[in-house]
Amino acid sequence: MNVVTAIGNLASDVSVREVSDEHKVANFLLAIDRPSKDGGADFVPVSVWDKQAESCERFLSKGQRVGVDGRLRSRSWEEEGKRRTAIEIVANRVEFLSGPREGAGAEEVFEAAAAG
């Protein structure tokens, strides 16, 4: 079973790009507080697809609190002769837990289209 739920704050603004004529992907970095005396946070990349990607771009900005439900995906690539690996959350749902960015409209919850 590959299921993840996380709550945190956006550590970056949302960036959206078209990956084909029919699909868009939004990416942002989620800062998730560590439950320890030392504190700190883990910074996890999040990918959101299609209609929800557009909603995230419209309503979210750095610093806002969100809840994310989705799955983990690992990626590997070569960079300067070295093998690199990254793990990201592919979101099925993003819940906006703090108000929308200024001028964006009412707080809303969006379900992601099953893409990615």
Give the ranges of each region predicted by the language model.
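Short beta-turn/strand-loop junction motif enriched in small, turn-promoting residues
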Residues: 12-16, 33-35, 53, 73-77
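Beta-rich strand-turn-strand
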Residues: 49-83
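C-terminal structural segments of small proteins and small subunits
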Residues: 75-100
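Acidic, gly/ser/pro-rich intrinsically disordered tails
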Residues: 1-2, 14-22, 37-39, 54, ...
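The conserved catalytic core of RNA pseudouridine synthases
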Residues: 38-48
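Residue-level recognition of specific faces of alpha-helices
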Residues: 3, 27-29, 45, 86, ...
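Short aromatic-glycine-enriched beta-strand elements
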Residues: 17-32, 85-86
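OB-fold and OB-like beta-barrel modules that bind single-stranded nucleic acids
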Residues: 5-12, 30, 62-73, 91-94
